[in-house]
């Protein structure tokens, strides 16, 4: 099973894909588009520092290949689980919000009174 974030350089941006995109959404609030997250070269140091703070293995494929392996301290899998949970909760909140937007004012008042 995969245990490292793979970061690919493409011009003036870096990209991560699939599960790694969820991790980046969780750590940096970057938007996921088509299972991909991109960030500018200027954010590279911030990204690497955050991955190291969270002891997440990574591989950077850019001008040169850079690898960081935290061995048994690696938290890739745990952070991925948290990332997927966060995504699931936010998607559920979007569904709820969509339903709330369709309610009449009176129905909204009832919902709010129940929640309070």
Give each language-model segment a name.
Residues 1-116:
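Basic, polar low-complexity surface loops/patches
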